[in-house]
Amino acid sequence: MASTTSDASEQESANPSEKNGDGSESGLRAADPEPAVKMDEADTDEKPGGHEPTEQSPEEATRDGGNDEDGETEKEQQKSPGSADGTAERMKREQREEESVSLPAEKNSGGGGTGMKRRASLEMMSSSSDGEPLSRMDSEDSINSTLMDTESIPSSGRSTPAMMNGLGGASSSTKGSSYPCCWDQCHMLFNTSPDLAEHIRGVHVDGQRGGVFVCLWKGCKVYNTPSTSQSWLQRHMLSHSGDKPFKCVVGGCNATFASQGGLARHVPTHFSSQNSSKLSSQTKVKEESPSKAGMNKRRKLKYKRRRSLPRPHDFFDAQTMDAIRHRAICLNLATHIESQGKGHSVVFHSTVIARRKEDSGKVKVLLHWTPEDILPDSWVSESDRPQLKTKVVHLSQLPQDTAFLLDPNIYRMFF
């Protein structure tokens, strides 16, 4: 029995050493011990039934290798010494059958690579047959799968051990601070918009001196545009910070606004809606009371009649004003009431239209006054002519029968 097993082991160990030079042949030879063990098991278990031996995968051989060889040794010990030669011949025959089955499959799959895989599986089987546990290989597979999982985790956005140890602190802090300050050369980050607004107001707005205030917010439409109003800059920066400090004063309303003007436009909407609701309720009450239906009808007719009456129109429009102004200018050019008469006197200008010499030897001239047809012509001494070139007459002293010729309004005012 011992000699038979030693011959089989020597034959198995000699097969890989004979073909070390050729990769494909070594792979084919290295695969021989595996089917020998497996087929022996299959033969001992399934030979009485008459079934053909089945080929097992390397994983199944790895799992069952240790138990199979233990069972094989126990069966061999139970056999008699007379059957040892028959067992060796049967193993050789099964070995040759397995070679004929495995050669086509290995040629189709590439020979050398399959041989290396066979050799690795044989090493695993030998280690398992020697009694070593397969926990080392399982642990290596689990480590490889763990490394692959950890490499794929950052791409999906989940936290990794490196990130938990502090390598991802920058990204987490960036996500937490969602309100950055975009002022020129300022890189502060804030968690809330009121904090950002307070920072802008205290550092960037109140920090400007000299009476000139500019907005240096990156991307602003009025970037670096000077202004003399600090209050304008404070209101303008609310649009960048997103803060809305002006809250609605009406109870139950949670609306907030970035400017006082927006709040002022919002508040009246509450009262207008209340008034409209009151009016609608009043109309409903009136419609529901039949006793007031006749009164409402009469009121409607009364209002309709009032609307149908012709409305008085004011004809003193812009064109009328222009006409009056033109007439006043022409009157002043003729009478100099405004320019020289101080608004209450008419200035008359004289021209000599005739001359005569009396018996006494005096020379007289006939003066004609303009504006015309107001004062009558008069004879004066030629020596008095220089003093009578102009004559100022108050409007109240004008002749009543000719004063209206200046202007009808003058006549209405003083006569």
Curated annotation (Swiss-Prot):
GO annotation, biological process: chromatin organization; regulation of transcription by RNA polymerase II
Keywords for this protein: Chromatin regulator, DNA-binding, Metal-binding, Nucleus, Repeat, Repressor, Transcription, Transcription regulation, Zinc, Zinc-finger
Comp. bias intervals (Basic and acidic residues): 31-66, 87-99
Compositional bias per record (Low complexity), positions renumbered to this chain: 272-281
SMART domains according to UniProt: ZnF_C2H2 (SM00355)
Feature: compositional bias, Basic residues: 295-304
Chain intervals with Polar residues compositional bias: 1-18
Region ranges (Disordered): 1-117, 123-142, 268-304
Gene Ontology CC entries for this record: ESC/E(Z) complex
Function field: DNA-binding transcriptional repressor. May interact with and stimulate the activity of histone methyltransferase complexes.
Identification of the protein by name: Zinc finger protein AEBP2
